[in-house]
């Protein structure tokens, strides 16, 4: 965990993600990425020179078979406030509207519910669990499927909602996330959603895996190019415009 904490701290500092006095909500989906983000920030908050507070926040969409009680217990052990918001999104998407392509609507409704909850609690900063591999895959998806160079940014300010998104796990590789989740015995919540899975991202994962046999430093080269090029928002120390 010390290695991951070091990577998270460097990412936070490189992109000036956290200021003194911040309250940072971690969007907890129950997956390994968001739970590790929560764990890392909770530990970082104990010694980081800019004092900040961490809260966990989950939008419970009503998917049958999903329980976040284990996450609640974990938050108590971490000493982190846990905000749970129940919204009948599953019912709307699958039972009322019977969407053929439900993921887009579900994501839109969850973002809206999250924004409302943050506003109600006076929180203006949220940490998301995207990691190193997510960034590389998103970059390639943008290039291959959209014909452009693009990716989410380490720090994104959403002017419409006055919310800042940060991604402190960006220097952490997926294999490190997997290993840490096992070692820490994180209370991962299995997602039984009938639409769970992202075909295009899986295609890109398989493409990268097939190329890494010949080019083992492929992901490192792509990630480095994103910072050196740099993509908008990716230049370390603000060197991105």
Predicted regions and their residues:
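Charged/polar, solvent-exposed surface patches and flexible loops
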Residues: 6, 10, 14, 73, ...
């Amino acid at each position: 965990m010390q290695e991951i904490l070091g990577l998270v701290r460097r990412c936070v500092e490189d992109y000036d993600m956290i200021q003194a006095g911040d309250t940072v909500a971690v969007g907890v989906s129950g997956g390994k990425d968001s739970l590790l983000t929560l764990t890392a920030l909770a530990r970082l908050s104990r010694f980081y020179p800019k004092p900040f507070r961490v809260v966990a926040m989950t939008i419970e969409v009503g998917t049958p078979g999903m329980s976040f009680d284990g996450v609640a217990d974990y938050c108590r052990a971490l000493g982190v406030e846990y905000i749970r918001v129940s919204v009948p999104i599953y019912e709307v998407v699958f039972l009322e509207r019977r969407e053929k392509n439900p993921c887009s609507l579900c994501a839109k409704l969850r973002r809206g519910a999250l924004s409302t909850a943050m506003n109600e609690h006076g929180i203006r900063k949220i940490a998301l669990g995207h990691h190193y591999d997510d960034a590389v895959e998103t970059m390639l998806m943008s290039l291959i499927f959209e014909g452009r160079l693009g990716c989410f940014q380490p720090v994104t300010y959403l002017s419409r909602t006055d919310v800042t998104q940060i991604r402190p796990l960006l220097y952490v590789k997926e294999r490190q996330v997997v290993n840490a989740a096992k070692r820490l015995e994180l209370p991962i919540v299995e997602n039984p959603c009938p639409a769970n899975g992202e075909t295009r991202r899986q295609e890109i994962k398989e493409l990268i895996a097939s190329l890494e046999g010949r080019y083992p430093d492929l992901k490192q080269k792509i990630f480095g190019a994103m910072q050196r090029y740099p993509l908008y928002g990716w230049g370390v120390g603000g060197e991105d415009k």
